[in-house]
Amino acid sequence: MRNYVEIVDVTARQILDSRANPTVEVEVILEDGTEGRAAVPSGASTGAFEAVELRDEDKEKYMGKGVLKAVENVNNYIAEELIGMNVFDQVLIDKTMLELDGTHNKGKLGANATLGVSLACARAAAKYLGLSLYQYIGGVNAKVLPVPMMNIVNGGKHADNNVDLQEFMIMPVGAPSFTEALRMSSEVYHTLKSLLKSKGQDTGVGDEGGFAPNLNSNEEAIQIIVEAVEKAGYVPGKDIFIALDPASTEIYEDGKYNLKSEGKVLSSEEMVDYYVTLVNKYPIISIEDAMAEEDWEGWSILTEKLGDKVQLVGDDLFVTNTERLKKGIDKKVANSILIKLNQIGTLTETLNAIEMAERAGYTAVVSHRSGETEDTTIADLVVAVNAGQIKTGAPARSERVAKYNQLLRIEEELGETAEYRGLNTFYNIK
């Protein structure tokens, strides 16, 4: 194996994501003609502390959401720095882009520019070596297939309905393999669709493939999922658990949590009690962004009350950022981090966040964004780092299913060495 393979070309273009918004795609060409390609996702409910997604703001084109500035930054500035570099120097490649940007949040080049390049380089390197991406990133010990955290009922910013909490998910922890987990989840999804139809509910889907029915309360969404799990022939709390993503920053106004569908305005303490009631009543194993991103006091109360029995995931709270994560670890809030590549903007920084979380005994959940493409990098990443959990939407819409299908291929490729840890994934809760 040659240990120095030159990058000879870096090219970006504007493509469309799953919401008909422009996004960045990058191709990296190596000296022997090997090509790596990556496309960048985009979020709807974004944390205030995320790296900057550069948009053109030209209202005459794509409602101002064009990404030609980011494309230009790749083609005119990043390419010039990276051409001639060794594709295997991933850390140096990412460091070079950080230095070229020079801001704390990638506000100059755009995280959508740097991430596209970072991932395309990794893909090109893996392809040159004849390795799958998960093998290249993770090495010989990459073997754990993730428990899917499947969003099957949408509310909040992901749907036009009267449900406040953003995502209601299922986690098939009782499955013996990823393949079986996917089958179980798919069966529950179909059963839920039939159930909603029988109740006269709309079965149109939201951004992430989940259904978006108009329900009387957030709790009703949980109830109908439990009913679907049972009707599909599974046992809630044994075969399949429930996970929530309230996206609480979106409902946090003037220091209070506004549950409009239920006519409730709650303090931090009351919001925690609201979750405690739900956890005591239903088989809920994980809650993401239960409190707002700057409600550190609320997070402390929540972690004290539920931190030993429920996975408490920080998304907007941590934004895949080691500085934010370190603050959370020091304050002893949450016990898990959501990993979104585009929140931070390079592969190296993403891996650093996962490593810091694991050292502190926090679990990591690798995640998509609501605006996705056919790019399957996160499927390889979750296996590469043995994270054990992936959040990539319902088993519907091809930009979501692409990730699940890639995981099926990886499980097949790993054969007998593949592990699906199920309930053991949640090693830091009882």
From Swiss-Prot:
<feature type="binding site">
    <location>
        <position position="391"/>
    </location>
    <ligand>
        <name>(2R)-2-phosphoglycerate</name>
    </ligand>
</feature>
<dbReference type="InterPro" id="IPR020810">
    <property type="entry name" value="Enolase_C"/>
</dbReference>
<keyword id="KW-0479">Metal-binding</keyword>
<comment type="pathway">
    <text>Carbohydrate degradation; glycolysis; pyruvate from D-glyceraldehyde 3-phosphate: step 4/5.</text>
</comment>
<feature type="binding site">
    <location>
        <position position="315"/>
    </location>
    <ligand>
        <name>Mg(2+)</name>
    </ligand>
</feature>
<feature type="binding site">
    <location>
        <position position="340"/>
    </location>
    <ligand>
        <name>(2R)-2-phosphoglycerate</name>
    </ligand>
</feature>
<comment type="function">
    <text>Catalyzes the reversible conversion of 2-phosphoglycerate (2-PG) into phosphoenolpyruvate (PEP). It is essential for the degradation of carbohydrates via glycolysis.</text>
</comment>
<dbReference type="GO" id="GO:0000287">
    <property type="term" value="F:magnesium ion binding"/>
</dbReference>
<feature type="binding site">
    <location>
        <position position="369"/>
    </location>
    <ligand>
        <name>(2R)-2-phosphoglycerate</name>
    </ligand>
</feature>
<feature type="active site" description="Proton acceptor">
    <location>
        <position position="340"/>
    </location>
</feature>
<dbReference type="Pfam" id="PF03952">
    <property type="entry name" value="Enolase_N"/>
</dbReference>
<feature type="binding site">
    <location>
        <position position="166"/>
    </location>
    <ligand>
        <name>(2R)-2-phosphoglycerate</name>
    </ligand>
</feature>
<keyword id="KW-0324">Glycolysis</keyword>
<dbReference type="Pfam" id="PF00113">
    <property type="entry name" value="Enolase_C"/>
</dbReference>
<feature type="binding site">
    <location>
        <position position="370"/>
    </location>
    <ligand>
        <name>(2R)-2-phosphoglycerate</name>
    </ligand>
</feature>
<dbReference type="InterPro" id="IPR036849">
    <property type="entry name" value="Enolase-like_C_sf"/>
</dbReference>
<comment type="similarity">
    <text>Belongs to the enolase family.</text>
</comment>
<keyword id="KW-0460">Magnesium</keyword>
<keyword id="KW-0456">Lyase</keyword>
<feature type="binding site">
    <location>
        <position position="245"/>
    </location>
    <ligand>
        <name>Mg(2+)</name>
    </ligand>
</feature>
<dbReference type="InterPro" id="IPR020809">
    <property type="entry name" value="Enolase_CS"/>
</dbReference>
<dbReference type="GO" id="GO:0005576">
    <property type="term" value="C:extracellular region"/>
</dbReference>
<feature type="active site" description="Proton donor">
    <location>
        <position position="208"/>
    </location>
</feature>
<dbReference type="InterPro" id="IPR029017">
    <property type="entry name" value="Enolase-like_N"/>
</dbReference>
<dbReference type="GO" id="GO:0000015">
    <property type="term" value="C:phosphopyruvate hydratase complex"/>
</dbReference>
<dbReference type="InterPro" id="IPR020811">
    <property type="entry name" value="Enolase_N"/>
</dbReference>
<dbReference type="GO" id="GO:0004634">
    <property type="term" value="F:phosphopyruvate hydratase activity"/>
</dbReference>
<dbReference type="InterPro" id="IPR000941">
    <property type="entry name" value="Enolase"/>
</dbReference>
<feature type="binding site">
    <location>
        <position position="288"/>
    </location>
    <ligand>
        <name>Mg(2+)</name>
    </ligand>
</feature>
<keyword id="KW-0964">Secreted</keyword>
<dbReference type="GO" id="GO:0006096">
    <property type="term" value="P:glycolytic process"/>
</dbReference>
<dbReference type="GO" id="GO:0009986">
    <property type="term" value="C:cell surface"/>
</dbReference>
<protein>
    <recommendedName>
        <fullName>Enolase</fullName>
        <ecNumber>4.2.1.11</ecNumber>
    </recommendedName>
</protein>
<keyword id="KW-0963">Cytoplasm</keyword>
